[in-house]
Each structure stands twice: as structure tokens, then as C-alpha cells.
Amino acid sequence: MTEQGYITRTIEISGRTFSVDIGRVAGQASAGVLARYGETVVLVAATREALREGLDFFPLTVDYEERHYAVGRIPGSFMKREGRPGEKAILAARLIDRSIRPLFPRNFTQDVHVVALVMSVDQDCSPAITAILGASVALTLSDIPFAGPVGAVIMGMVDGQLVVNPTLEQDEKSDLHLTVAGTREAINMVEAGAKEVSEEIIVEALTKAHAEIQRIAEWVGEIRAEVEPLGLAHPKIEVPANEPGPELVEAVRSAGYEKMRAAVHHCKNERLDKKSADRHLEGTKAEIINAVLENFPEEEQRLKSLVDKLEKEAVRELVLKEKVRLDGRAFDEIRDISVEVNVLPRTHGSGLFQRGQTQVLSVLTLGAVRDEQILDGLDTQETKRFMHHYNFPSFSTGEARPIRSAGRREIGHGALAGRALEAVLPGEDVFPYTIRIVSEVLSSNGSTSMASVCGSCLALMDAGVPIKAPVAGIAMGLIKEGDEVAVLTDIQGTEDHLGDMDFKVAGTEQGVTALQMDIKIAGITPEILAQAMAQAREARLYILDRYKEVIPGPRPEISPRAPRIIHTTIDPEKIRDIIGPGGKIIRKITETTGVDIDVEDDGRVFITAPDPEGGKKALEIIKTLTAEVKVGEVYLGRVVKIMDFGCFVEVIPGVLGLPGKDGLVHISHLAHNRVRKVEDVVREGDQILVKAIGFDNQGRLKLSKKEAMEPPAGGAGETGRPGLIQDDRPDRRPRSRFSRR
């Protein structure tokens, strides 16, 4: 222990030091630690409230708060302080929540609040991983009952090699970004984005990740044993058993077991849809409750809980013992699929995907570069050109609730589907559009996020976006009792609710592009995940084949209703020629052609035009404004001014009422013979060939008419007078400016 009264413990993870300060911060919390990974620092505090009676769920809240001072920035908002968490922060909070939630006792109903405050960010050391590990230590040291500790790592794949916790540079090159959390015994959370990585590599990465997780979890467990005698770890509180009496349990079982089994079999035999099955099962549960309630009038809440458990037992028994599902399907059977495109005629692209009673309409919009989302988070990325937004209205589940703004679930599902598609999107150099897809869930009965992947892929192809390959997604489920395991393909809502796992897999024919696993039990092994991924691949290939029946690939042209974007690159030094003083020139271009123009600092120019002609006209104007006269090139120019010492010739015409680029043809360069008067050779308005021969010391263009012409045969001059040749006197330069402004 230090003189300040706290201790620090460290462990090496992927060549960098992870440490926790214990007893240093957040003394009023149940436990608080200062977690440090490299130069990333996250304060994590865990607190609990007193027992709340009558709850049938665990009220866990996880907040992940980003502070802009962590990267030396001031927030960009008007108030100059942090507001509601951004998308990245919400996704990080969900990672922590999903890593720890399965490890609390089932009958524990006290409010638990875990706060991760990001205070310093080293881009090579993930603050999300730091927060998960900090939460693991805090919960392990607290008095909150917790079946941890938890470890977590990110797996990358750089140049074909798996890397634990890749640095920022490695992550940018990586084909895989796989976040894994778990205990010493098993994995309980997976989240991944990938570039068509094979299932075998994913399983190998999970196995390697779990080995590192076991080492970290072991270290956290040792910390508790070490600091408990010092008073820095608290005895775990007792969780009230709150178990119903044996008489009530027996009464429910006697009155309801056979009825519930019969109800479940009726749903299976009749292959009832969600509404019909729910109505039948709820009716059966009400019968059982009414039959028992008259003998136990004060036990209504426990009675309802027991009947729910009876339903769960009957459904799980059907699967494990009879090898068939509630709706009569086999374990690897997919519900009926419907695929449509071009559903909405005035949009840029749309896809309607239905699997059973899950239905999602995805709508795509193509926009200009200026439509990119501006990010104000802690990452180095400043803008985002692809957005996927997911909406889940109440009518999709048959409920009558007000529609609210997007919550954590909607943001999480939208990000997952977006991640699944990012790997196949064309680069900005090929397709310089901002892409926004909105997935509207119209009906929900399991796996709406994966239906959003399918609907969004259809919308991309319908819009003519040149994706590398079509993507499909499927949700896998698990029912596990002891050593008995059933992996289910394409789970519906009831199987999600009563099962042990929701494992979502998306990808192409070549490999996986996204993964997400939510689990309700303490963990599962890599072997079970491998089986789930193998079944998911078969389902994915089946869905991709169904796409081909309707739309075999992206349309050859983008939607006629989408804007046209023309991309060109100019010398960054020429940007001022497009912008003009106070933006005068660029405004004139947009007003004249009806286009939008975005100019990047590196010289990339994007012209967004509602019609092709306007875009072409704007491009020509920009090319003219930024054109360079090359020494040695011959130009067809127009004489714009006659002077005693020569003439000015415009070699690049002006546009939008602006002057073009001109230069001086000195009288000595008008002809091979001696010229006494400029008007003897040219007149104002004449079109003549001239050659660019250089620039004077003030950067003014010098042109030559005689060098653009063949020398006269036999030495005769243009006037036919033999023997007259160009004298060797140097050019005389007047003091007046050569270029017209």
C-alpha cells in the first residue's frame, strides 16, 4: 500500500501495462478503481441500492461517459460541454452491460449502477476494453454479488496474423475487429466487424481470446484475495432466496404441467404464428393461475413467476427431448422468406425483406460529401460517410405505445447492421457518395437486426451502389441444459425470450462481416460457437440464393432520382482559384449550374449535380479556372489586345465573366521575319496558334507565334522578302502588367 493509502496492481496485456489503483478514488461507491491501459485512463465505479420488492427483472444500468478533455479538446456544441452520449459511447456501454449482466444472480433485484468515466485516451489502448476490465475489478471488490471476474480483449488480424489488442495503426490495417469478454470458464460476449473473414479464423480468434481472458480473470481474482485483508474488498451481501413454498410449487406443477405441455404441443402441431401462439399460451397460463390462485390468494406474484417458468420448461423440453421447435421447425430450418426491391418509387433505393413474421423495409438515400456525419467523439475519425439507422415502432409488436427517439437498443441494432455492410461498400475514390440507410421494422418476431442487414443490402443493390458482394444475416439461438445442447437457426421471439443465447452472424458467400452474441447463462464454449457459425453459414448462403431470384447484383446504373457526383482532383494551390475572394467564384459556379461543390484541403473536388448536364458544365468551369499553361505546348488563342511592343493572346478562355489566362507575344516573336508593326501580322479578335515559351521573373506568361509555326523554306520571311531573319536582340519588357484581371 502506498503512503496515500491505496494500492496499484499491474498486468501485461499485449506488450502494454494494464493497472488498477484500488482505494484511491470514488470512496463513497460500493467500489471504485482507476483503470489505466497505456495512457488510457478510465474511472469505474459500481454502486447498488437497497432491495426493491416485486421486481421480476434485474435493474442494471451501465453508463459510459466520454470527456473531451481526455483527448485535449473542447466540445463543439454551443454550450461547450458534453451532452447526451454519442453513438460510440452508447455502444461501449452496451459492451460493458452485455459482458457483466449474465453474471449476477437470477433472483437479485437491487438496482446496480456501473459508471465508466473516460478521462484520458491513448488511441493505441482501447478505452472500452479498459472500462470492461475496470468494471470487472470494481464489481469483484464490491459487496455486490457477482459471479466474475471478467476479462476482455480485442482480436485483430493483420497480414494474416491474429493480434491481441491491436494498436490504432494495426487496427486500421486489420481485417478483423473482434471484441470478446468472458470468465475463466467460458465466453459470454462477442461483438465483431470483419472483412469477409472465414468461420475457421473467427473460431481460432475466439479460442486465442479466451486463453488471454482466462489469464486476466485469474489476475483479477488474485487481487481480491490480496486486498481483502487490507479492507479494500467487501464481503458479498446475501441474496434473499425469495423462493416460493413447496406447497405452491407442487400446486402449480400438479395443475399446470400437463396443460402447459399440451399447449406447447398444440402450437407445434398447428404451426401457429406468433399472435396465435402467444394467445394460446397466455390463455393456458391464465387457466393455471386461476386454478391455483383460489388456494393461494396472497401469492399472485410468485404464482405468475412459477407459471412462466413452467412455460419455459415445456418449450425447452420440447426442443431438447423431442428435437422439434415450438413452431414445428427443425433445428436448422429457416422460416419462409420474401424479397422485394424498388418498393418506394421516389426514393433512391429500397428493399423489403420478410422472414416469417419479421418484416423490415430498408430505404437508401445517396447524398453529397457535405452530407457526411460530423463526429464529435474521442476518436481520430472526424466524419462518417455511411450511416445505418434502425427504427423499431411499437406497432411492429402489436403494442400501443408512443413513439420515442432512438434508444440504446435501436442504436445498437443500427450499428450492428451497418457494421455488417461496411466491409462490402465501395471506397470513396470509386463511389464518392454519402450513404444513409434507414431500416423500418414493420413486424417483429425475432432477429429484426439481421432482417435489417438483408433489407439494407437489397436497398444498396436496388440503388445501383457497386457493393463488392451481397450480405445476409441470420440469428442463431441456444438451449442448453447440462450437457444437452440445441443450436437453433433463425430464432423467433419466443425462442429468444426462453432460450440461452442470441447469436447474430452476417456475411457474404466468402466470409463473415459482423457478429454479435447476447447470452443469458454464465458462458458458452468455443465449440458451441463453432457449431452455431457453421449452421449460420448454411442459412446465410440460402438467403443469398433467394436474393438472386429477385436481384442478382447491383443495378448497372445508380437510381435516376439520385444526384450525380463528379470527382476530380486539382493542385491544392489552385483551390483559391475555385473559391475566389469571400467565396464569390464558387457561389457563382453553383448559381450558374445548379450544383453543389465540396472542395477538400488535399485538392479533391466533388460536384453534386441534380442532372448530368449541370455537373458536366461545372466540371468544365473548374477545369478552366484551374488549368495551367504548360511551357512547350502550342495553344489556339485569341488576340485580345494590341500594343506597340506586341499583342496579348488569351490561351485559356475566361468563364462566368471572369478573365481567362493570357500572355504576351512580343513583336519579335510574331513572325520569323522582322515585324515593324504588330497590325501587319495580327488584328484584335484573330485566332492564332501560339507556343508557351516561359514566364518572366514576375511570373507572367510569354508566348511565341513564330515558334508555333514551321520555319519558312529557303529562309524567306512571311512577307516573301528573302534574307530577313529574326534578330538576336533581347525581348523588351514594358512595365505594365501582362495579365488581365
Swiss-Prot record:
Enzyme class, first EC level, given as a word: transferase
Which cofactors are named for this entry? Mg(2+)
Its annotated compartments are: Cytoplasm
Pfam families, alphabetized: KH_1, PNPase, RNase_PH, RNase_PH_C, S1
Q: InterPro entries this protein is in? A: ExoRNase_PH_dom1, ExoRNase_PH_dom2, ExoRNase_PH_dom2_sf, KH_dom, KH_dom_type_1, KH_dom_type_1_sf, NA-bd_OB-fold, PNPase
Q: Where is the S1 motif domain?
A: 632-706
Question: Tell me, which GO biological process terms does this entry list?
Answer: mRNA catabolic process; RNA processing
Sites binding Mg(2+) sit at 496, 502
Q: Which SMART domains match?
A: KH, S1
Primary localization class, coarse: cytoplasm
Write out the catalysed reaction: RNA(n+1) + phosphate = RNA(n) + a ribonucleoside 5'-diphosphate
Task: List UniProt keywords, sorted A-Z.
Answer: Cytoplasm, Magnesium, Metal-binding, Nucleotidyltransferase, RNA-binding, Transferase
Entry-linked CDD domains: KH-I_PNPase, RNase_PH_PNPase_1, RNase_PH_PNPase_2, S1_PNPase
Q: Which GO terms describe its molecular function?
A: 3'-5'-RNA exonuclease activity; magnesium ion binding; polyribonucleotide nucleotidyltransferase activity; RNA binding
Residue span(s) of domain KH: 563-622
| Region annotation (Disordered) ranges | 703-741
Asked if Cytoplasm is a keyword of the record, the answer is yes
Give the family, as the similarity comment puts it: Belongs to the polyribonucleotide nucleotidyltransferase family.
Protein name, please?
Polyribonucleotide nucleotidyltransferase
Q: Which organism is it from?
A: Desulforudis audaxviator (strain MP104C)
